[in-house]
Curated annotation (Swiss-Prot):
Optimum pH is 6.0. Its main location: plastid. Major role in the synthesis of nucleoside triphosphates other than ATP. The ATP gamma phosphate is transferred to the NDP beta phosphate via a ping-pong mechanism, using a phosphorylated active-site intermediate. Shows the highest specificity towards GDP. ATP binds at residues 93, 141, 169, 175, 186, 196. It is an enzyme of class 2 (transferase). Its EC number is 2.7.4.6. This is Nucleoside diphosphate kinase 4, chloroplastic. Coiled coil: none annotated. The gene is NDK4. Homohexamer. Belongs to the NDK family.
Amino acid sequence: MRSQIYRSATKAARSFLSSSKNASSRFLPEGRTVAATAAVSLRVKAPYLASFGGANASGTWMSTALAIPAAAYLLQDQEACAAEFERTFIAIKPDGVQRGLISEIVARFERKGFKLVAIKVVIPSKDFAQKHYHDLSERPFFNGLCDFLSSGPVVAMVWEGEGVIKYGRKLIGATDPQKSEPGTIRGDLAVVVGRNIIHGSDGPETAKDEIKLWFKPEELVNYTHNAEKWIYGDN
């Protein structure tokens, strides 16, 4: 019975949260306003319903009165937490794919605590590669760079986490592997700049543009990772 209560509470909480987005409170943050509304509503109903069902009905409705605001607050808290996290675009280039380095690279981001929210394998056209490297169109190596990116399969990914854009770049290392520190992906796994195995967004705006170029909105998965409380929790 209690599991049914909490499932119903979560469903009701989602409904409250959805409707509250169109009418925010002047006095309380959105989640707390919704929770308070749910609690007040059920406290009014509980005595009335209890008169028909006795103590068990009263206990059930009071449990629900506690469950709905709690669920609403937790859902709101999850949404707020997710909104704080950055997202970055990471691509394993054809050389990294052909050398069998996919799992090695993915593992490094996972071990850091970042969350994978999108991944696919594609062979981009040269036109697509030119769109990706549009900011380098005036550089002498532009044509060769686009030829290489479109020469084979690319593993395109979106990673999420606190500081993922800046730290992702540190994790990747300098563009020239010869200048990359040991411990970085390029420092450990690449030798020359023309085969530096991986690409990562260099800033928030670039990340947004690259994610939009490579992925449709529905390909990005929003979810709460079970390890997040062990990664981001406060003591």
